[in-house]
């Protein structure tokens, strides 16, 4: 028995990027189909392993609690923990871009979708 689906867009992978893409397309009233290799209980991919933590710079939560951060400070931390090699130009560019755009592209995007934040400082290094 074969199953047929009709969709405007097929998204392969239900990790963070796939789910964000799906939300954006649903906002535009597209019909979507998401295919993922995992079972439904593991929906979210590697994002689930981050304990829900997201790196963002300059959020109202940080300012309210007196946490001083900047893209420059965060980039120095990122470079130190990532252990980039000499030829890692694109990963460095990505880190710089992300840190300079995390407030608008991540924090405000999530806030517009009524995502609530539990303001706890986490370190990726778990240190």
Q: Language-model segments: what does each one mean?
A:
Residues 37-127:
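Conserved N-terminal/central alpha/beta ligand/cofactor-binding core
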Residues 1-6:
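A short, basic/flexible loop-to-alpha-helix module at the beginning of a structural domain
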Residues 7-34:
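N-terminal Rossmann-like FAD-binding beta1-loop-alpha1 element of flavoenzymes
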């Amino acid at each position: 028995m074969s199953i047929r689906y009709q969709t405007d867009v097929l998204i392969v992978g239900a990790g963070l990027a796939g789910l964000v893409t799906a939300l954006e397309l649903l906002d535009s009233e597209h019909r979507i189909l998401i295919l993922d290799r995992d079972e439904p209980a593991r929906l979210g991919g590697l994002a689930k392993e981050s304990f829900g933590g997201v790196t963002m710079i300059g959020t109202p939560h940080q300012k309210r609690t007196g946490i001083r951060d900047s893209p420059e400070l965060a980039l120095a931390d990122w470079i130190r923990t990532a252990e980039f090699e000499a030829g890692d130009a694109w990963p460095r560019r990505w880190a710089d871009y992300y840190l300079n755009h995390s407030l608008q592209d991540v924090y405000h995007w999530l806030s517009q979708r009524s995502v609530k934040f539990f303001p706890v400082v986490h370190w990726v290094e778990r240190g």
